[in-house]
Every structure is written in C-alpha cells, then in structure tokens.
From Swiss-Prot:
Component of the mitochondrial ribosome small subunit (28S) which comprises a 12S rRNA and about 30 distinct proteins. It comes from Mus musculus (Mouse). This is Small ribosomal subunit protein bS1m. It is found in: Mitochondrion. Belongs to the bacterial ribosomal protein bS1 family.
Length: 186
C-alpha cells in the first residue's frame, strides 16, 4: 500500500512541477508584444540569464544559423562525379606507375610506406644509404599492384593481406636537391 501511495504522490508531484514550470514565463525571455519590446533599450546592459534560459538562447541561435546555411546551399556533387575526378581513378591501371610515398613506420629492415592508395606498401631497406631511410622521409616507388589478394584453392572469396606491392626506387629529397643544384649552374 505504501508503494502505491508513493507512486501516486510522485505523479501528483510531477504534475505540480510541470504546471509550475510551464505556467510561469521565463525571466529575460523576449515577448512578442510591441509595447514591452519598445521599453527595452538595445544599448542597455542585459541581465545575464541563467541555466535553462541561456541554454535555450544558445540552442535557438544554433538553429537560426543552421537555417541560414540551408537557405544558401553549396552545389552538391554526386558520388559518381567525385569518383570520376578522384586521384585514384585518374591514376588508371596501377601497374608500373611511379608515385611518391612517405615512410610512416620502420620495423628492423622493413619500411612501411604510405603513397595515398587504399593500402600502404612494405619494402626492404636498401643496403646502400640505408641510414637515410627514416620516418617521414619521402621516397619514390614503382607500383606493381594496389592490393595483394589471392583466391586460395577451393575458396569462394579473395583473401587480402591489406598491403600494396611496390618497388622502392630511392629517396625523393636527394633527387630534388640534385635538380636544384643543376639549375643555378645553367
């Protein structure tokens, strides 16, 4: 019986709170009547609204800004158009393409190189000038395959090792510095 009284008292209390909250106008809330808005001077300092009122004002401002953005929409580009103009599609068949990548990870003599494709490639560190191949170094690559996949005997799906296949050609910075040295001597 006590549980029933508590639940009934809780609903009565919540009804009372709802009536109290929604019957009173919010302080500092603007009204639509012209006489009251005329008495407020725009240059007079506004009283700082608290809690719910300030949250409501911020939310209303965000809604107004969102509506303004919707009124002036940017031209929407279709997925087909974005795909057609993407650098990966412009590349064409990947076999024997020369690209520039950046070394982002090194494990012993394995260089993990990101060249902007779907997957990165792993190349061995060369014996000559191997100490120059550090993280962040830009290198030249010749792509062999963008994704190493294979269909195993009896399998119905391709299995990938999430890597691309490429041959490391050398450092990009050294090639750039040589061309810079040749230009002033001409």
């Amino acid at each position: 019986m006590a549980a029933l009284c508590r639940s009934h008292a809780g609903t009565a209390g919540s009804r009372f709170l709802r009536a109290l909250v929604f019957s009173k106008p919010l302080r500092n809330a603007s009204t639509e009547s012209g006489s009251e808005s005329a008495t407020h001077d725009s240059s007079a300092p506004r009283a700082r609204s608290g809690g719910f009122a300030s949250a409501l004002e911020r939310h209303s401002d965000l809604q107004r800004k969102a509506e303004l953005r919707l009124e002036s929409p940017k031209p929407v580009e279709s997925f087909a158009s974005m795909l057609r103009h993407s650098p990966l599609t412009q590349l064409g068949p990947a076999k024997d393409k020369l690209v520039i990548g950046r070394i982002f990870h090194i494990v012993e003599d394995d260089l993990y190189i990101d060249f902007g494709g779907k997957f990165h490639c792993v190349c061995k560190r060369p014996d000559v000038d191997g100490e120059k191949y550090q993280r962040g170094t830009r290198v030249r690559l010749r792509l062999l395959d963008l994704e190493l996949t294979s269909r195993f005997l009896g399998g119905t799906t391709d299995t990938t090792i999430l890597e691309a296949d490429a041959v490391l050609l050398g450092l990009q910075e050294i090639r750039d510095s040589k061309s810079r040295e040749e230009q002033p001597s001409k």
